[in-house]
Amino acid sequence: MVVLAVLLPVVFGALLLLGLPRALGVLGAGLSFLLNLYLFLTHPGGVAHAFQAPLLPGAGVYWAFGLDGLSALFFLTIALTVFLGALVARVEGRFLGLALLMEGLLLGLFAARDLLVFYVFFEAALIPALLMLYLYGGEGRTRALYTFVLFTLVGSLPMLAAVLGARLLSGSPTFLLEDLLAHPLQEEAAFWVFLGFALAFAIKTPLFPLHAWLPPFHQENHPSGLADALGTLYKVGVFAFFRFAIPLAPEGFAQAQGLLLFLAALSALYGAWVAFAAKDFKTLLAYAGLSHMGVAALGVFSGTPEGAMGGLYLLAASGVYTGGLFLLAGRLYERTGTLEIGRYRGLAQSAPGLAALALILFLAMVGLPGLSGFPGEFLTLLGAYKASPWLAALAFLSVIASAAYALTAFQKTFWEEGGSGVKDLAGAEWGFALLSVLALLLMGVFPGYFARGLHPLAEAFAKLLGGGA
């Protein structure tokens, strides 16, 4: 079943790239969402729907996939965000085909149980993102593309060395995750392996100062917001630290933990500070994403079960509300021709539905209780406090700042006087709005249900690091 979930969007994406109608892509995105909703609702715990087949058996490489509670949650949020984008983003069929292809590669990344296969999906998921930027981006897309590729190469080569070292230096017979965990690295080897992983994953989180690719990536991408929403979903560094880097090299992590905690807190505060000064929605959301990923990383780096669980939940939730805000920004651009904050005012008068959706998405971003951002932020800060009270305080300041920049942007755009004449939500946009709000409410009101598969993983993670029961 997990293989079907990975292949379904890839097949529909390939059909769209061959020139079939865009409506087929909406159907494919909808079917993918329904399938992943079913997989999440029926997930029995543990690693379900496991699939394993030899790829290069002589080299110890296997097509190995499985769905645990963590990957099941990400399968759901990724498929939901792509479906929402397919509903409302006015893009041509081939663009949507690239989006579906990227969805399938992201699902493969989150389900991979073989380290080398994970590396392949980790890198392959970049290809559709690069093509969307190159083919459909703005005037400065070439520079943004070069920056993106440069940072990717800086992380990719050390990561490949770490992947090979994790097996060869440990004596594991295969690249399968369970075999690697059963053959722990020696302390010196663990440091170098972790360093290779950490560089790549810090770029893809991203953490300050390895975030320079992020603002131009969003600013120059297609104004529909679909590529930006997918870029939000590709911020997989926190997941990769939790799934691979830290469990495979805990001694290496222990040597770098203090620095990583500091960089995570700094990323949270720096991102919030720059977002407050942003003049357009894409820049605001890019730096807000940096800030939220810093908070999520802080939770995982704390090594506590609360922090890890909160950081991962925040990562999943942010894909929905940040992705939703990028798509909303695309709707604003279609109506006004600009993304500049304050350029259009008083939108709530002529577009109350659009304004209500924006308010709920922004409130989820700032962590209002009852919406999806709150449970992850609360648990993350709780876990971070146990590891470092003063760094948790810095992260808390970023949460306060998020309310300032988000609500200020909302006020300038929707609430101040200035008859805008912008039309309200219509047609499929109402479906986008209702599904988004429903997801934000359910994840905020019933976090225990959505995070039911995270708790045992977070406990095992903390126990590995000496912080669990």
From Swiss-Prot:
Topological type in the membrane: Multi-pass membrane protein
Keyword Translocase: yes
Coiled coil: none
Enzyme nomenclature, EC number: 7.1.1.-
Main location: membrane
Any Pfam family: Proton_antipo_M
Entry superkingdom: Bacteria
Membrane spanning stretches: 1-21, 23-43, 47-67, 69-89, 91-111, 115-135, 144-164, 190-210, 258-278, 284-304, 308-328, 354-374, 390-410, 430-450
Record's catalysed reaction(s): a quinone + NADH + 5 H(+)(in) = a quinol + NAD(+) + 4 H(+)(out)
GO cellular component, one term: plasma membrane
GO biological process: ATP synthesis coupled electron transport; electron transport coupled proton transport
Secretion signal span: none
Localization (cell): Cell inner membrane
Keyword Ubl conjugation: no
Alphabetized UniProt keyword annotations: Cell inner membrane, Cell membrane, Membrane, NAD, Quinone, Translocase, Transmembrane, Transmembrane helix
A GO term for molecular function: ubiquinone binding
Similarity remark: Belongs to the complex I subunit 4 family.
Subunit structure: NDH-1 is composed of 15 different subunits, Nqo1 to Nqo15. The complex has a L-shaped structure, with the hydrophobic arm (subunits Nqo7, Nqo8 and Nqo10 to Nqo14) embedded in the membrane and the hydrophilic peripheral arm (subunits Nqo1 to Nqo6, Nqo9 and Nqo15) protruding into the bacterial cytoplasm. The hydrophilic domain contains all the redox centers.
Function, as annotated: NDH-1 shuttles electrons from NADH, via FMN and iron-sulfur (Fe-S) centers, to quinones in the respiratory chain. The immediate electron acceptor for the enzyme in this species is menaquinone. Couples the redox reaction to proton translocation (for every two electrons transferred, four hydrogen ions are translocated across the cytoplasmic membrane), and thus conserves the redox energy in a proton gradient required for the synthesis of ATP.
Protein name per UniProt: NADH-quinone oxidoreductase subunit 13
Organism listed in the record: Thermus thermophilus (strain ATCC 27634 / DSM 579 / HB8)
